[in-house]
């Protein structure tokens, strides 16, 4: 895939109507935004376009309204908060059909530097099916398209891909540019040693990632729920731990592939276990890899955490996707904390692949110590799998 795409700095936007696909899919509680990270992430692109005298038309989805208007998934709270952040009124075009009379009038009345926000694109059933009719309507409002929503770059929807069929100029915003730079370099030309850490519950979610990364990394570290499937593949007992029986054979193949490729594959050598999945369960540390009857693994053990941390300390590039244990439960958060600490203390390029690991790093207060925290869980995974991301492929090449 070609990651060398035109950015907003490569196009003349003065006086032009610029449709910007943002990721404003933020959590709401009673109409209040509880996590503003995604809004903050969009500001550099919006501010640049304002300074350059563009007419800025923002669009995004929120949640899964499944093709019909749902008041609780309206982008009105986003328009209000953005107005405060930009010190400028963001006009909210509240049309249930997204491109309706309000949107058309708001866009018609725009002066250079003005900002309009359209209603939730997923109010339209055509959006997720990438149907022409809605793509055309969105494109009809603008002269130029800018995609700055990395979180949905792996989806071919009207607002990410379809509009590019009708707008000649299509470039990426600063957020996607940054994602492409860091993730692209990690996958294409990493500084070595290159260490990848994969956690989370399921091997099946990460099958292609494991396979692709074994061709690229020097060390692959595996923790989290998926570690138990690998332990079973090595012949250890895993008690009542999470396991994917149908992936045991695949895990054996990956262990063999790592040997073949000369990749240092690190798996747990001890575990923190409990007799139930509960935040108040008593943690027990195992002597070795084996987990006894009636117990389930809920975190990597201290010896494992030390080995993983040492591997991170000697790395020049580290990519992490997925926690090492049930970090929401205090007694089983230590593995994730140790990995995050080792990355925070490292002078390597450290990249967090969105989703749960990003949440963990931010909760632990290490966010500002990382080189880059990806804004897209699913998109960053597909990127690490080596897949082409439709929302990026559709933009103009440099």
UniProtKB/Swiss-Prot annotation:
Q: Does the keyword ATP-binding apply?
A: yes
Pathway the protein acts in: Carbohydrate degradation; glycolysis; pyruvate from D-glyceraldehyde 3-phosphate: step 2/5
Q: Which annotated residues bind substrate?
A: 23-25, 38, 61-64, 122, 155
Q: What is its EC number?
A: 2.7.2.3
Keyword field: ATP-binding, Cytoplasm, Glycolysis, Kinase, Nucleotide-binding, Transferase
Q: Name one GO cellular component term.
A: cytosol
- Please name the HAMAP family in this protein's record: Phosphoglyc_kinase
Q: Can you say what this protein is called?
A: Phosphoglycerate kinase
| Annotated source species | Clostridium botulinum (strain Hall / ATCC 3502 / NCTC 13319 / Type A)
Taxonomic classification, please? Bacteria, Bacillati, Bacillota, Clostridia, Eubacteriales
């Amino acid at each position: 895939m070609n990651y060398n795409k035109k950015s907003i700095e490569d196009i003349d936007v003065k006086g032009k109507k610029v449709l910007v696909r943002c990721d404003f899919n933020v959590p709401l509680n009673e109409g209040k935004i509880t996590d503003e990270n995604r809004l903050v992430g969009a500001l550099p692109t919006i501010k640049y376009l304002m300074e350059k005298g563009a007419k800025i038309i923002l669009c995004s989805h929120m949640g899964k309204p499944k093709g019909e208007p749902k008041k609780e998934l309206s982008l009105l709270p986003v328009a209000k908060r953005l107005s405060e952040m930009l010190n400028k009124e963001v006009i909210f075009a509240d049309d249930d059909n997204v491109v309706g009379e309000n949107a058309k009038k708001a866009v018609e009345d725009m002066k250079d530097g003005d900002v309009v926000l359209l209603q939730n694109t997923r109010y339209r059933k055509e959006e997720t099916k990438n149907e022409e009719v809605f793509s055309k309507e969105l494109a009809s409002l603008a002269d130029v398209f800018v995609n700055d929503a990395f979180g949905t770059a792996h989806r071919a929807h009207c607002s990410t891909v379809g509009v590019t069929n009708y707008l000649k100029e299509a470039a990426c915003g600063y957020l996607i540019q940054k994602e492409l730079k860091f993730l692209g370099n990690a996958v294409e030309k990493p500084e070595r040693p290159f260490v990848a850490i994969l956690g989370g519950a399921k091997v099946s979610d990460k099958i292609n990632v494991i396979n692709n990364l074994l061709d690229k990394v020097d060390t692959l570290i595996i923790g989290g729920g998926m570690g138990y499937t690998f332990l079973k593949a090595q012949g250890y007992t895993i008690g009542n731990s999470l396991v994917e029986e149908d992936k045991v054979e695949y895990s054996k193949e990956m262990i063999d592939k790592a040997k073949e490729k000369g990749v240092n594959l690190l798996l747990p050598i001890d575990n923190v276990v409990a007799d139930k999945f509960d935040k108040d369960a008593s943690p027990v540390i195992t002597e070795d890899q084996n987990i006894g009857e009636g117990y389930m693994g809920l975190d990597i053990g201290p010896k494992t955490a030390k080995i993983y941390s040492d591997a991170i300390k000697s790395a020049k590039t580290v990519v992490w996707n997925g926690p090492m244990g049930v970090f929401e439960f205090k007694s089983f958060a230590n593995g994730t904390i140790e990995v995050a600490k080792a990355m925070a203390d490292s002078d390597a390029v450290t990249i967090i692949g969105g989703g749960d690991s990003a949440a963990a790093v931010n909760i632990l207060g290490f966010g500002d110590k990382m080189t880059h925290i990806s804004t897209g869980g699913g998109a960053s995974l597909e990127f690490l799998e080596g897949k082409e991301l439709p929302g990026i492929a559709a933009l103009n090449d440099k």
